[in-house]
């Protein structure tokens, strides 16, 4: 099987016998690649007929499913740039979502916004205010004639806000997208039509490229679940791999592994065989070696091999993949000694997980505050360059990080990490750290420590910042017993050496998260400063 040449090459000769199976309320719904390509051609004709011209932006506000796939590829066939937006279902209050949609459309400035017919009334005001036109998927598909034209050079406007809450559009060219897809193909040694299963949402870079564009480029059978389906029943996802003729490749963030551990017991895996599960790519957030080992322990009796765990590092600004562990290599763990240098360790709490070497066409450096390379095994800022790099941002907010991230031909990621024997070990966000005893302490480090105290990983987030001139560490806890608060305060006081401690305890969904599950630390920090996240009277250690 040749490597993917272009994101649209599969539409020229689509296969009728292979495709994507989407999990719905009535079970699996199979769409062959031939059916998807034909529907995408009709969508392209409808978009072109409604006024979309080459180079225009089309925003897709659709759940992960066949409607999204048809709209995404249809917009590309019409010569448009596609910008996927998280659907309202991932937000908990419609008012918050409409405000978010207004901000997003102000960045993307689309010609058309495509959504489900049942959502048109809800989104109408936001789309009109942005000067765009809202159309339903159903109406478009009913009016289209087959059409295709030369695709736009700007393939994607990938919206991202990270922990800040301020949306930015990452400009991903066709060239960068094709380069990264080829790199992923070689890194994972995908071979001929590898079967895969995914649940990450299509509006997220990991779900879009790893869970849709890669399977489509290979015209490989794929099982696609929505994130809510996975959260409610992770066993449904595991069945995609454990039953005969099942998937070989999967992707998920660390919290996905944790969800499996918490929700699936060994007796429910009886009769499954995971020996064909070649790779589960794990990325999108700080990786936890304890979770890696627990996931392996759960599935190993049923044929899962530890070497199938494939830690990876990536970000939308580099299209997706930056580095990843190669096949059949087991994850490597290191910890930082008192001098801040990396030393090998086992899968102990707080250890860093190696995310492999840079993928083809990508170069990684780790530098100090002045941009000079740091010694091997020493923490600095991760800087990325290469053929997969995006062409910069589109943003309505002139924050300093966005203005300086793309410097020359390099990307300053804002992530801390280290290189050891050519392998990248991500540590955390530079903006989510503080100096303690002369060393950088990251919010992720404190969250790991609190999990070891007995806090579920999904129920804790740590915020670091300054209140005036006073450094503060804030622990945001969800649905935890009152007696846990004093233990959390005591541990944080010990780890942060006299930094002021506050604890916020609230119900489920107190912790704001991105659509990929990362805490929105900066957004919550602003709410804390504004008095919207009220701390308990837990005291302030001296």
Feature-to-residue mapping (PLM):
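AMP-dependent adenylate-forming
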Residues: 7-32, 154-157, 164, 314, ...
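Conserved pre-ATP/AMP-binding loop-to-beta segment of ANL
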Residues: 16-18, 143-159, 165-166, 180, ...
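AMP-binding/adenylate-forming catalytic core of the ANL superfamily
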Residues: 242, 386, 391-392, 414-496
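Conserved AMP-binding/adenylate-forming core of the ANL superfamily
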Residues: 19-65, 69-70, 90-97, 148, ...
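Conserved ATP-binding/catalytic segment of the ANL
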Residues: 2, 354-365, 370-377, 381-440
